A protein has these predicted regions:
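A short, compositionally biased
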Residues: 10-13, 36-40, 105
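Tryptophan-anchored aromatic micro-motifs
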Residues: 14-20
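A structural detector for beta-sheet-dominated domains
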Residues: 5, 21, 30, 43-45, ...
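Mixed-charge, Lys/Arg-rich low-complexity intrinsically disordered regions
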Residues: 1-13
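Generic beta-strand hydrophobic packing signal
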Residues: 8, 32, 47-50, 56, ...
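Intrinsically disordered, low-complexity, charged/polar segments
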Residues: 49-71
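Active-site-proximal loop/hinge segments that shape catalytic or ion-binding/gating pockets
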Residues: 65-272
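Basic/aromatic-rich interaction segments and small domains that mediate binding to polyanionic partners
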Residues: 20-55
Length: 272
């Protein structure tokens, strides 16, 4: 694992993303110049690297913090590549899709603070993390998803697949190797480091036949803080209400996949 550093060669930052927030890539760092007033001037190009934008001036401490975040993101990207992780997934009711395509996926707290109407997938958040959104790596938590569908047989459901770059950009994502509401975690537990991401693929009890992109425990989850912007959505998968969902995804510019295997269970279900 990486060691965060206390000294940097500031020119090593050239070519990396600059983040206007902790999860939105804003620009590419084009040049860094040390200024006479002990500030560092970062010149930026737009995200497509086609034109110059304004510069920002940072103190050395701010520059160091920026560099360490970039190191974490680089390592996280390497983990996703090594595990061949192509998507994270989130299931919801079809009736929520129109709002989700417009506003992104929002936490319960964000939704309650807004005027957005929604139908919750989980009435009882036992993890009590109402500022977080539950997702899974590569395949839904099929035990929970199945139980929700059985409890609500008249409700149409959808699985949204999401670009895993989201967890590279959002450094406050939390990684749980089993269900966050399992009772083994304290309320103030905050597993945001890359070590916790790796722990989701622990060897003990792992079925050797599941894809390496699957976490060991099918109830493992990633909690995303407050919002998942719709720019990260890759596709939507459903089994019912196909014409409605097709129309919504076409308008939103998102791929649609009917009769998805993501409504099934993992091949290692007998172990769990």
């Amino acid at each position: 694992m990486i060691n965060l550093i206390k000294n940097i060669n500031y020119r090593d930052l050239i070519g990396y993303y600059y983040y206007i927030s902790d999860y939105i890539p804003y620009a590419i760092i084009d040049n860094v110049i040390k200024m006479p007033n002990n500030y560092y001037r970062i010149y930026l190009k737009d995200i497509k690297n086609t034109k110059y934008l304004n510069y920002v001036d940072l103190t050395y401490e701010e520059l160091l913090s920026l560099n360490n975040k970039l190191l974490i993101r680089k390592e996280r990207s390497e983990i996703l590549k090594e595990r061949n992780i192509k998507k994270i997934v989130h299931f919801t009711k079809v009736e929520n899709l129109e709002s989700i395509f417009e506003n992104g996926i929002l936490s319960v707290n964000r939704l309650n603070d807004s005027s957005i109407a929604y139908s919750p997938s989980d009435l009882f958040r036992l993890d009590d993390k109402l500022n977080m959104i539950s997702t899974s790596i590569s395949f839904p938590n099929y035990k929970m998803f199945y139980s929700k569908r059985m409890e609500n047989p008249d409700i149409d459901w959808a699985v949204i697949t999401i670009d895993p770059k989201l967890i590279i950009h959002k450094l406050d994502s939390e990684f749980y190797k089993t269900n966050a509401a399992s009772g083994i975690y304290s309320f103030d537990y905050s597993p945001t480091s890359n070590n916790f991401l790796l722990d989701m693929f622990y060897d003990e009890g792992r079925d050797p036949n599941i894809p390496k992109s699957y976490p060991t425990d099918p109830q493992a989850e990633i909690l995303i803080n407050n919002k998942m912007p719709n720019t990260y959505f890759n596709s939507v998968e459903t089994r019912k209400n196909i014409s409605k969902v097709k129309s919504l995804t076409r308008t939103a510019g998102i791929d649609y996949n009917p009769n998805s295997h993501l409504f099934s269970y993992r091949s290692d279900y007998k172990r769990w």
